[in-house]
Amino acid sequence: MQNTIRIIGIDPGLRRTGWGIIDTLGNSLKFVASGTVTSDGEMDLASRLCQLHDGLADIVHAHKPDEAAVEQTFVNKDAVATLKLGQARGIAMLVPARAGLPVSEYAPNAVKKAVIGVGHGEKQQIHMMLKILMPKAEFKGDDAADALAIAICHAHNRGGHRMRQALAG
């Protein structure tokens, strides 16, 4: 008998960190919740990171996921922006890890491929497929939609991902 696994997908960002929670049982996906944690751009960096930490910690505490998936970040031409995004991503990985959850990472093209079938697609294609895969899904904005897509990617890949982690030691 299979158990339902609750997955939180996290799309890290310093201004807005999207989160999406799904339940998966076998091949079935069920929307649970989604949203965005924001930080105040007028505050210093440390305070903004605290806001992201506290917001994500509240979500993890309220929804009690079993596993987490975080999108890997890309390097852009602005080194300072890349560094800040990396710090927000660190918070996105730290919060579920501190709650005892296994945390997996996925490249953006792997997320798109899992949801829309190709590694390069538009946001509207992701939104459309989310509604097809989970008709009751509700999301406001790209960040929450991306987070749900990350959770779906993990649901599709979690068995192989666990095996690779076990083999890596």
Swiss-Prot record:
Cofactors demanded by this protein: Mg(2+)
PROSITE patterns for the chain: RUVC
Main location: cytoplasm
Localization of this protein: Cytoplasm
Residues annotated as binding Mg(2+) 1: 11, 143
A Pfam family hit: RuvC
Reaction(s) catalysed by this chain's protein: Endonucleolytic cleavage at a junction such as a reciprocal single-stranded crossover between two homologous DNA duplexes (Holliday junction)
GO biological process: DNA recombination; DNA repair
Catalytic residue positions: 11, 71, 143
Class of this enzyme: hydrolase
Keywords: Cytoplasm, DNA damage, DNA recombination, DNA repair, DNA-binding, Endonuclease, Hydrolase, Magnesium, Metal-binding, Nuclease
Keyword Nucleotide-binding set for record: no
EC number(s) per entry: 3.1.21.10
One function term, GO molecular function aspect: DNA binding
InterPro entries: RNaseH-like_sf, RNaseH_sf, X-over_junc_endoDNase_Mg_BS, X-over_junc_endoDNase_RuvC
Residues holding Mg(2+) 2: 71
CC annotations in GO: cytoplasm; Holliday junction resolvase complex
Cofactor info, note text: Binds 2 Mg(2+) ion per subunit.
Record keyword Protein transport present: no
Family statement: Belongs to the RuvC family.
Function: The RuvA-RuvB-RuvC complex processes Holliday junction (HJ) DNA during genetic recombination and DNA repair. Endonuclease that resolves HJ intermediates. Cleaves cruciform DNA by making single-stranded nicks across the HJ at symmetrical positions within the homologous arms, yielding a 5'-phosphate and a 3'-hydroxyl group; requires a central core of homology in the junction. The consensus cleavage sequence is 5'-(A/T)TT(C/G)-3'. Cleavage occurs on the 3'-side of the TT dinucleotide at the point of strand exchange.
Assembly and binders: Homodimer which binds Holliday junction (HJ) DNA. The HJ becomes 2-fold symmetrical on binding to RuvC with unstacked arms; it has a different conformation from HJ DNA in complex with RuvA. In the full resolvosome a probable DNA-RuvA(4)-RuvB(12)-RuvC(2) complex forms which resolves the HJ.
Descriptive protein name: Crossover junction endodeoxyribonuclease RuvC
